[in-house]
Amino acid sequence: MTLKERRVGDVSILDLKGRLVLEEGDDILRSRINDLVSEGRIKIVVNLQDVTYVDSCGVGVLIAKYVSVRKKGGDVKLLHLTPRSHRLMEISKLLNVFETFDSEERAVESFAVQRAK
């Protein structure tokens, strides 16, 4: 799996490509989010548009990083879930946990709305 990072204001967007699975993508995502949190960047959008497969380990990384970022006062939101990723999140009841978006603009704007509450 590859990961490219972009920033829109104070929001970090992580564009993933490939398989988010044990020993292929889990360490890459975990490490980058840990680095972002260390830098104080706790508004994170994970773009899953080009992710071809997610296994339970990949889901575990998303959950673990969601929890650790929330403890620091931030949030992790998901963008462009593929039908397969959406179904996996639905089955595992994670659509009730993560905010998901089909629009990058809305995902980024949601942090401003969240702060205003």
Sequence positions of predicted segments:
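Residues that form or immediately flank small-molecule/cofactor binding pockets and catalytic motifs
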Residues: 8-10, 83, 105
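Amphipathic alpha-helical interaction surfaces in cytosolic regulatory modules
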Residues: 20-98
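STAS-typified acidic loop motif
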Residues: 2-31
